Amino acid sequence: MNEILNTKDINVIGEFFIETWGCQMNEEDSEKLSGMLKKEGYIRTEERENADVIIFNTCCVRENAELKVYGNLGILKGLKSKNPNLIIAVTGCMMQQKGMAETIKKKFPFVDIIIGTHNLHNFPNYLNEVKKKDTSVLKIQEKENSIIENMPIDRKNSMKAFVTIMYGCNNFCTYCIVPYVRGRERSRTPENIEAEIKKLISEGYKEITLLGQNVNSYGKDLEPNVTFAELLKRVNNIEGLERVRFMTSHPKDLTDDVIEAIAKCDKLCEQIHLPVQSGSSEILKKMNRHYDREKYLDVVSKIKKLIPNVALSTDIIVGFPGETEKDFEETLSLVKEVEYDSAFTFLYSIRKGTPAAKFEDQVPEDVKHKRFNRLVEVLNEISAKKNKAYEGKIEEVLVEGTSKNDENKLMGRTRTGKLVNFIGDKDSIGELVNVKIIKANSFSLTGEEI
């Protein structure tokens, strides 16, 4: 169980700034970094210039994320010159890549701490080492640890929380670097997961998102085995919990038991993120996804049959090596058939160290961009159509705060994950309320509390 942080009575010894790139797992890692530092006596600042410690928590899933890290590190050189006592640390998946830590140290010698994903829990020790010995730390642990429990955590949100149920991935999709930087699959025990959720409920949290690179593989490494469907049922029975979400699911492992659990468990939200990556069976085979188009559509059909009002989202890669116009057309036709509520779309990006990086039939950049734009146009049309169907309906919304676009309105999300901006009572923040949807927008809904 992770420790919920109470920062009362801690003597302040400095300020820290964290910048995070990447997925929800990285976001939770940053919450743990923040928790550890606050326990040491630091306070968080949102201004780099005010910080005594600056931490970059990096991502390497796509090239663009790495380029952002390089650019931002370059900016820090000036800050370090002005304040030689500033401590700069870089961690995360990008650092876990073979040779990357040494590259960063060579390009940016002013960086004080470089660590990977497997020794994050030791960050306070490394920080103290730098401060006391006036030295730098470069420690990349190649082998993953057993799971570290009871880490302090500084949650960004007071009503919704991420709870990691497993770490790592065993799938080795040919384009993906994750198994190399996050290690093999390791599951937390259901007892530790339940204990963390119960603690969160006692702190006032209403919604939990269960995290893992492939949550459907949960429990296979435990003795005795516990299936993901069984875990969902156990979590659903926790008293006081209002909502449960999870991500990410791998289509090859999404069993009938899991679909049935979502349909029957009242706290499980009717929202499933099911990355397809491509609609072409030929490309899926090259990606090593372990399913084909027919299998994926069969899973979707089962989901829609048991959960008629489900909102489906997905990930799609455009321009994977060898993708022909025919392959891309198959992706478009699958998108139209499934009718996703939303999608994360990406241009294929070569990841050094993955099998796909060596594939010779790379797709030209201009072709990738044209296909990407065509795909986004289709997805946006479908999303607008799906949102339009909400007009006139009454939806349960967890009120998260005031709207970013209009401080006189509130904002929150439906059980299906739709963003709703609505007129309501500010006393409702943190509560579940019923909202009548008045208008559908391209990427959100507008309504009024009833």
UniProtKB/Swiss-Prot annotation:
It comes from the Bacteria. Residues 388-450 form the TRAM domain. InterPro entries: Elp3/MiaA/NifB-like_rSAM, Methylthiotransferase, Methylthiotransferase_CS, Methylthiotransferase_N, Methylthiotransferase_N_sf, MiaB_methiolase, rSAM, rSAM_horseshoe. Transmembrane segments: none annotated. [4Fe-4S] cluster 2 binds at residues 169, 173, 176. One of its GO terms (cellular component) is cytosol. It is an enzyme of class 2 (transferase). The keyword Iron applies. Residues 14-132 form the MTTase N-terminal domain. One of its GO terms (molecular function) is 4 iron, 4 sulfur cluster binding. Its cofactor is [4Fe-4S] cluster. One of its GO terms (biological process) is tRNA methylthiolation. It is found in: Cytoplasm. Keywords: 4Fe-4S, Cytoplasm, Iron, Iron-sulfur, Metal-binding, S-adenosyl-L-methionine, Transferase, tRNA processing. Binds 2 [4Fe-4S] clusters. One cluster is coordinated with 3 cysteines and an exchangeable S-adenosyl-L-methionine. Belongs to the methylthiotransferase family. MiaB subfamily. NCBIfam families: miaB-methiolase, MiaB/RimO family radical SAM methylthiotransferase. Monomer. This is tRNA-2-methylthio-N(6)-dimethylallyladenosine synthase. It comes from Clostridium botulinum (strain Hall / ATCC 3502 / NCTC 13319 / Type A).
